[in-house]
Amino acid sequence: MAKQNRVTVNGESRNFPETANLADVVRELKLEPERVAVELNRTIVKRDLWASTLVADGAEIEIVQFVGGG
């Protein structure tokens, strides 16, 4: 069994494989990448870096979704 990292996403504790990156987290949560901003350990990560940014054990991730309206 692959090692799992315990990660906090928007205040909720979750497990992800130790090889998971930010793009994997967004995909696992079934979010549209074009409509979210991701912060890792209080630092905003640009979308083009998500796939190369691994999610370490104990990481804190905040994801903000953009919604249209008027």
Feature-to-residue mapping (PLM):
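Ubiquitin-like/PB1-type beta-grasp interaction modules and other compact soluble beta-rich domains
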Residues: 1-69
